[in-house]
């Protein structure tokens, strides 16, 4: 228990230094409500009418997502498979990625294709990792880049919905390389 508290204080201090008080409080609220209620805070997670990003949810969160018309779910967590716990939706894509690391190119491609398919059908997709601040936003950013946005524009879009995201350096490197590759492919 002491180790858990020390780790929490360390994470909180790091966020305060890097993101400031306001963003850290929003992040803490965004983590606390889902933890205690099992329901993600969708008002912070709606990036577009069909693409949502957020934290892990529990059974009540799954019911809420279904009641809001969600059929597609992307889980970025290597440490937790929604299907093993009965939390998957009608259409489920598990892209196990270690926290704070870049998504593999294979998973990036599969994730983008999965999101694109849902959006093309006019259906909502919920992308999550543990906290909804690193892995899930990274995939969402890559999806928007694949649709022709610049990384800067995609970051603005996602941060407008979820201002406390924190893309780790390896994730940002991946996104920059993906943007360069996507831009080169579009002009070729």
Which residues does each PLM region occupy?
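Cysteine-based protein phosphatase catalytic domain of the PTP/DSP
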Residues: 36-124, 145-179
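A phosphate-binding catalytic loop at a beta-strand-loop-alpha-helix junction
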Residues: 122-141
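Non-catalytic regulatory/accessory regions that flank a structured catalytic core
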Residues: 1-36
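C-terminal domain-closing interface element
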Residues: 180-188
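Generic detector of bulky aromatic hydrophobic side chains
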Residues: 5-10, 126, 140-141, 157, ...
